[in-house]
Structure formats: C-alpha cells, structure tokens
Swiss-Prot record:
Residue span of the annotated presequence: 1-15
One GO term describing the cellular component: mitochondrial matrix
Keyword entries, A-Z: Mitochondrion, Transit peptide
Cellular location(s): Mitochondrion matrix
Cystine connections: none
InterPro entries: TrmE/GcvT_dom1, YgfZ/GcvT, YgfZ/GcvT_CS
Organism: Phaeosphaeria nodorum (strain SN15 / ATCC MYA-4574 / FGSC 10173)
Family assignment from sequence similarity: Belongs to the GcvT family. CAF17/IBA57 subfamily.
Predominant location category: mitochondrion
UniProt keyword Coiled coil, yes or no: no
GO biological process, one term: iron-sulfur cluster assembly
Protein name, per record: Iron-sulfur cluster assembly factor IBA57 homolog, mitochondrial
C-alpha cells in the first residue's frame, strides 16, 4: 500500500526584512548542476547507491519570486490551481485560458512571513528558465492591485536557495539554516526546503550530492518538473499528475484555465499520464522495475522518442505510438503513457488494449531499448481516491494527514 505523506510544513522563519532588489535570473537547469570543487570531490567518493537511497541537494535550477501586498492572496487566487488563502506551503500550477500548464510552482507561505510583512506574502518557486516569463505574467494581471513583485537573490547575505532531501536525509535537517520546509506532496519520501544562501549544507554532518540524484528520485517516483518535462502551453495538468500531487483544488472558485480542468474532472477520463519507466537493453523479458538504478546505462533513450509495442520477435511495431519519452538518466526516466494501452489501469468504461505480458520499446540508434512503465501502489491509491468511477471525491491524502496532526 502507499505510504501516507504529511503536508505539514516545517515552519521556521528567522529572517529580517526581505531585500527586494532585483537580480539576474540564474541559468536554466540542464539536468546536472555544477557544484563547488569540495562538493564534487565528495560526490566522487560517495556511493552512488547511497546517494540514490538518501541525500540532500541544492536546486540551482529553481528560482524564487517574492509576492506581497494587501490583496496578494486574492490576486494569486485567481491565477493558480490551488487555494491561495492558505498560510502553509503548497504545490500548484499556473494555467493559460485553454487549461494548459504555463508552469508548475511551489507557493512558500507561512504565518511568520505574513506577520513580518503585515499582510499575506509568499515566495513563488519556479523553474529558473521560466522566472522572467512568470514575472511578466504576474505583472500583466496586476492591474490595480497594490503588490510587490520581485526576483529573490540566490546568492549573498539576503539570498535564499531551494534544497531537496529524500530518504532518511530529512531527519538530519534539524533547524540548522533552513527557513521553511515542506514534505513534498508529489511523492512519498521527498522533502523540500528554503535556506539561507550562505549555507553550504542544510543537514548537520551531511554533505550535498549532485543534483542529478534529485532528478533520479523524481524519475523513480514519476514526478515531472519544469519546462523541459512540462512544455509550457501544451501540457495538461492531469497528464503531468498535478491533480494527484495535491496541486489542484477542484472546489475553489474561478481561476484562469478552470473551465477545461473542471470539465475533465467531471468526465472522469484522463487517457495519458506521465509515469516512471525503466529501460532494459537486449535480451528477453521486460525491464525489472526493482533493478538497481544505473546512471551509466547505455544506449540512452532521449526525450521525444516514441514508445511502441514490440512484436513476437522483439522488433518495434509500426502502429500508433503508445507513449513518448519525457526524460531519462541511466536506466530510469519519465514517459507520457497511454494508460489503458501500457498499464492494467482503466480510465474509461470501454477499457483499453493492454494485455498482460505486452512489451514496449524505443529505437536508439538502431538498437531496441525496452521500456517498462512502473505503476506504484500509492499512485493507484491516489488515482482511485480522486478519480474512482462512481465515487464522490474523497478527502485528499494531504487533508487527512493535516487532520491527524491537528
């Protein structure tokens, strides 16, 4: 069964008045971050298996935007998929008028920040490559709202950085340099923090690992992030599992993109979703979902490659693709999959064409690499809780966890 995740933020704030001086946005994330020499040295000495199982990593590919003002909550409420009246951190998305994702975001808000500012305020965490576009989007809708909207430095005395932790590493983050924390609602065992920029680590007696291990964690759990994995203005929020990540409040009022989102919820049919996948080159049989992660796996499938069924000889069929590669590191990755064609899950009354034992693959430089979708128990549990046929929408796993804490 799925692990229950807790959404209660680690609410710690000891900062002085936020410096709202604008700075240049950092470079777009390319899948790997370049760490200082000392940290790269640690990475070369650390066990790959250990780093995959548990670790902390800075996320230089994420930027922060500061939003504050007497009507900031009302303003943001009309632009995002979640309830912006909250006073604890949450996951959400900005949509365009057609209901397509502009960007996925974390909204960092906590009581101490609001008290410090004297009104509702937050940090909007977004893919660094989309920060400027999001700034323009916010200013375009500002109208007569009295708001402060500014980039947040990632360096210097007043800078703030985004960090991630996974496995047991979060137990080492003990009120030591972090500003706020959140148990990542997108998947079990993932955690997120804001920390002062001058911190080289957020965990006592624990050094950071390369950011690619954070990406591996996301891929293992099937968590897409940022513009490379959610192409702006074309990705639907349900296809990116934003609904299953507690990123959509289906009961909230009007916001941009709501019409298609609610219509999809009422029809109850989402035929494609991003799932974790494992790769296997050569030999008979499907890829083993329990096989160790191998970052050096080759040949490496590339984003955009079509996934097709394999015939009895192991060759790719010439029919309609059943999916498409979204991202990959080694033998793990993400793929947009036609649910009823590539898994045993059903999303419609008529069902799909999936048969037990069906195998899938991609062509990488003339070689067939097998692709195995991975469907976690917790993923199925979330999907059935939210989209189960004939059921009323149940309380989210986040709401249940919060009630237990209260």
């Amino acid at each position: 069964m799925a692990s229950r995740i807790l959404a209660a933020p680690v609410q710690r704030c000891r900062r002085s008045q936020h410096d709202r001086r604008p700075i240049a946005v950092s470079a777009t994330h390319n899948g790997f971050s370049r760490l200082p020499t000392a940290l790269r040295s640690y990475f070369t000495e650390a066990s790959t298996a250990q780093a995959i199982a548990s670790g902390i990593a800075p996320l230089p590919h994420r930027s922060l935007i500061f939003l504050s003002g007497p009507t900031a909550s009302k303003f943001l409420h009309g632009l995002i998929t979640h309830d912006a009246t909250r006073v604890s951190p949450f996951y959400a998305a900005f949509l365009d008028a057609r209901g397509r994702v502009i960007c996925d975001v974390f909204i960092w808000v906590w009581p101490e920040l609001i008290a410090q500012q004297g009104h509702w305020a937050c940090y909007i965490e977004v893919d660094a490559g989309q920060a400027n576009a999001l700034m323009l989007h916010l200013k375009r809708h500002k109208l007569r709202h009295k708001l402060t909207i500014s980039h947040v430095p990632a360096e210097g005395r007043d800078g703030i950085k985004v960090w991630a932790a996974w496995g047991d590493a979060h137990k080492q983050v003990k009120d030591w340099g972090e500003i706020a924390g959140l148990q990542d609602p997108r998947a079990p065992g993932m955690y997120r923090y804001l920390a002062n920029a001058d911190r080289e680590t957020i965990a006592r007696d624990m050094q950071p690992v390369d950011t690619k291990f954070y990406d591996i964690q996301r891929y293992i759990h099937g968590v897409p992030e940022g513009s490379a994995e959610m192409p702006p203005y074309s990705t639907l929020p349900m296809e990116a599992n934003i609904d299953l990540s507690s990123g959509i409040d289906f009961k909230k009022g009007c916001y941009i993109g709501q019409e298609l989102t609610i219509r999809t919820k009422h029809t109850g049919v989402v035929r494609k979703r991003i799932l974790p996948v494992r790769f296997h080159a050569g030999g008979a049989g499907a890829a083993d979902p329990q096989a160790p992660v191998n970052p050096s796996f080759a040949p490496q499938p590339q984003p955009g490659m079509d996934i097709r069924t394999l015939d009895d000889t192991g060759a790719l069929s010439k029919g309609r693709p059943t999916g498409r590669i979204v991202a990959a590191i080694g033998n793990v990755g993400l793929a947009t999959c036609r649910i009823e064609n590539m898994t045993s899950m059903r999303v419609s009354t008529e069902g799909g064409f999936y048969k037990e034992g069906t195998q899938f693959g991609v062509d990488v430089d003339g070689q067939v690499v097998r692709v195995e979708p991975v469907v976690h128990d917790w993923f199925v549990e979330r999907k059935e809780a939210l989209w189960g046929r004939g059921e009323k929408m149940k309380k989210s796993w986040v709401e249940k966890a919060q009630e237990e804490l209260d």
